[in-house]
C-alpha cells in the first residue's frame, strides 16, 4: 500500500513540475501568430533573392533545428498587408477547415524546397522567387495570420 501511495505522489510531483517548469525557466511558448511571423515574414528583403537565401533564412529562423523543414515560403510584403488578407476572400484550407483567406492580389514571395539529396544537419534548399496569391489561416479577435496554407 505504501508503494502505491509513493508512486501516486511521485506521479503528481512529475505532473506539477512539468506544468510549472517552463514558467520557472522564464521561457514562454511562441504564439501561433509569432511563429507565423518568424517562419514566413521577411518584408525587408530585396525583390530578388540570392541563390543561398533559403539556406540562410531557414537556418536563421530556426527551421533546421533537429530536422530540415521540407518546404517553406517567405513573404516579402509589409506585415500590415499580410494581416489585411484575413479580411479578404475566405476559402477552405487544405485541411478542410474554413479559416483560410486568399490574397486579392499577388505578393512577392520566396519558396524554399529541400533538395532531394539533402539530409539533416546539412539542410540544402532551392530558392525560387515568385509573384503569387497566398492563402493563410487566420484566428483570433482581431483575426491575425497563424498558418501559411498555400500559394497559387
Curated annotation (Swiss-Prot):
UniProt entry keywords in alphabetical sequence: Disulfide bond, Endonuclease, Hydrolase, Lyase, Nuclease, Secreted, Signal
Enzyme superclass (EC): lyase
UniProt: substrate binding residues: 35, 38, 69-73, 94
One annotated GO biological process: defense response to Gram-positive bacterium
Catalytic residues (positions): 40 (proton acceptor), 147 (proton donor)
Primary site of residence: secreted
Region described as Disordered: spans on this chain: 25-53
GO molecular function, one term: lyase activity
Subunit description: Monomer.
Family listed: Belongs to the pancreatic ribonuclease family.
Function: Endonuclease that catalyzes the cleavage of RNA on the 3' side of pyrimidine nucleotides. Acts on single-stranded and double-stranded RNA.
Protein name: Ribonuclease pancreatic beta-type
Source organism of this protein record: Rattus tiomanicus (Malayan field rat)
Amino acid at each position: 500500500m505504501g508503494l502505491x501511495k509513493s508512486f501516486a505522489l511521485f506521479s503528481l510531483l512529475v505532473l506539477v513540475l512539468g506544468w510549472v517548469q517552463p514558467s520557472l525557466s522564464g521561457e514562454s511558448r511562441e504564439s501561433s501568430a509569432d511563429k507565423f511571423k518568424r517562419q514566413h515574414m521577411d518584408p525587408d528583403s530585396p525583390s530578388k533573392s540570392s541563390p543561398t537565401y533559403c539556406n540562410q533564412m531557414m537556418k536563421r529562423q530556426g527551421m533546421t533545428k533537429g530536422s530540415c523543414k521540407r518546404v517553406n515560403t517567405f513573404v516579402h510584403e509589409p506585415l500590415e498587408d499580410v494581416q489585411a488578407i484575413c479580411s479578404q476572400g475566405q476559402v477552405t484550407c487544405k485541411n478542410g477547415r474554413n479559416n483560410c483567406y486568399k490574397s486579392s492580389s499577388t505578393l512577392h514571395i520566396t519558396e524554399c524546397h529541400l533538395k532531394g539529396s539533402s539530409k539533416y544537419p546539412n539542410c540544402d534548399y532551392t530558392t525560387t522567387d515568385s509573384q503569387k496569391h497566398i492563402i493563410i489561416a487566420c484566428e483570433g479577435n482581431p483575426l491575425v495570420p497563424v498558418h501559411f496554407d498555400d500559394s497559387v
